[in-house]
Amino acid sequence: MLDPNLLRNEPDAVAEKLARRGFKLDVDKLGALEERRKVLQVKTENLQAERNSRSKSIGQAKARGEDIEPLRLEVNKLGEELDAAKAELDALQAEIRDIALTIPNLPADEVPVGKDENDNVEVSRWGTPREFDFEVRDHVTLGEMHSGLDFAAAVKLTGSRFVVMKGQIARMHRALAQFMLDLHTEQHGYSENYVPYLVNQDTLYGTGQLPKFAGDLFHTRPLEEEADTSNYALIPTAEVPLTNLVRGEIIDEDDLPIKMTAHTPCFRSEAGSYGRDTRGLIRMHQFDKVEMVQIVRPEDSMAALEEMTGHAEKVLQLLGLPYRKIILCTGDMGFGACKTYDLEVWIPAQNTYREISSCSNVWDFQARRMQARCRSKSDKKTRLVHTLNGSGLAVGRTLVAVMENYQQADGRIEVPEVLRPYMNGLEYIG
């Protein structure tokens, strides 16, 4: 959520920045609502003061032995008017808040202006795509050759965009997640967390999934005996529970940064993706991801973004997977991000790079929703923290990249050296 004072005092400047990312802010509507809010605020305060004054007069009149009934009736009437004014003010403030919750974050000044993914800017490349002297098989064909990917079984169990992994392919999937967690915890300074896969509405509001992206989530039906408390949704990413661990907290600045990681399944409806990536593991309703989250001082967040992106890059480098790093343009950034780097890994069968990690600085956008603050020992004032999140990495897509980049002419899949300790020294699948 943006700073309400910024929306009130600099609406035109905010509108200009939002226009860079293709969002039209209705400045006139917000201005009219704000003027109405000011009028109601003054009215409420005046009624409150008048009622307090009249209430005090009742006691004074009673002490003088005067008839207090007219004053009592007047106080009651003022109370009714005050209640009505408060209700109108509350409704208006709720309307303003509802609008504010749909406004995306402001892009950082250095983010390239653009409309969509075609306007993203490549920053760097690492590694050289392998040249094959045989016909490249995609991961689906390789998985079926080794009886490791069973999409038909998943359709029987659930439906499309799910998979059953088996044997050494399932083992490699697990090995990848363990490797990523060990790297982030042992070398990059993250603490490992196990988090719920179901979260409540407040948590989803905190990180910005609600109200705007309710349709992207899988929601549970409340239990009858807990109808008011069990309106949960499956997490679309571990960013949601990890970041909300600091919701409502005031953190000592000496304890920052807080760096957390978790390996979880992620659940997404993929609304609007009909017909896209229907073959294989690239776009699933359920997929695993190792997530990185950092909670930092405001002045440290841009440096933290560079660091976090480097942590994701290290996974790809140790796996020997060619990739490119791009900075997303204003029109392609996520709702809460002010700056985002994507890492795209080389997928031989598609002869292109595909997203495997997205690392974002969310500035104070989530912190304001969550009321997550920090305070230094020398200053009693609190300030909002900055939050960052990044994939380190998407496990299923990493599996795709390993299978395709490490395939052999006979269909075997070489196991990258860094994964062999997690697979009992296995050198090849097949």
From Swiss-Prot:
The organism is Escherichia fergusonii (strain ATCC 35469 / DSM 13698 / CCUG 18766 / IAM 14443 / JCM 21226 / LMG 7866 / NBRC 102419 / NCTC 12128 / CDC 0568-73)
Annotated ATP binding sites: 268-270, 355-358
UniProt entry tagged with the keyword Zinc: no
Q: What class of enzyme is it?
A: ligase
Gene Ontology molecular function, alphabetical: ATP binding; serine-tRNA ligase activity
A GO CC term? cytoplasm
* Entry keyword annotation includes Glycosyltransferase: no
Location within or outside the cell: Cytoplasm
Pfam family, any one: Seryl_tRNA_N
Swiss-Prot/TrEMBL domain comment: Consists of two distinct domains, a catalytic core and a N-terminal extension that is involved in tRNA binding.
Q: How does it assemble?
A: Homodimer. The tRNA molecule binds across the dimer.
Protein role:
Catalyzes the attachment of serine to tRNA(Ser). Is also able to aminoacylate tRNA(Sec) with serine, to form the misacylated tRNA L-seryl-tRNA(Sec), which will be further converted into selenocysteinyl-tRNA(Sec).
Q: What is this protein called?
A: Serine--tRNA ligase
Signal peptide segment: none
EC numbers, comma separated = 6.1.1.11
Q: Enumerate the Gene3D superfamilies for this protein.
A: Bira Bifunctional Protein, Domain 2, Serine-tRNA synthetase, tRNA binding domain
Under the heading PROSITE patterns, the entry gives:
AA_TRNA_LIGASE_II
Q: Which UniProt keywords are given for this protein, alphabetically ordered?
A: Aminoacyl-tRNA synthetase, ATP-binding, Cytoplasm, Ligase, Nucleotide-binding, Protein biosynthesis
Its GO biological process annotations read:
selenocysteine biosynthetic process; seryl-tRNA aminoacylation
Q: Which gene encodes it?
A: serS
Q: Which reaction does it catalyse?
A: tRNA(Ser) + L-serine + ATP = L-seryl-tRNA(Ser) + AMP + diphosphate + H(+); tRNA(Sec) + L-serine + ATP = L-seryl-tRNA(Sec) + AMP + diphosphate + H(+)
Family assignment?
A: Belongs to the class-II aminoacyl-tRNA synthetase family. Type-1 seryl-tRNA synthetase subfamily.
Residues annotated as binding L-serine are 237-239, 291, 391
Q: Name the cystine pairs.
A: none
Its pathway? Aminoacyl-tRNA biosynthesis; selenocysteinyl-tRNA(Sec) biosynthesis; L-seryl-tRNA(Sec) from L-serine and tRNA(Sec): step 1/1
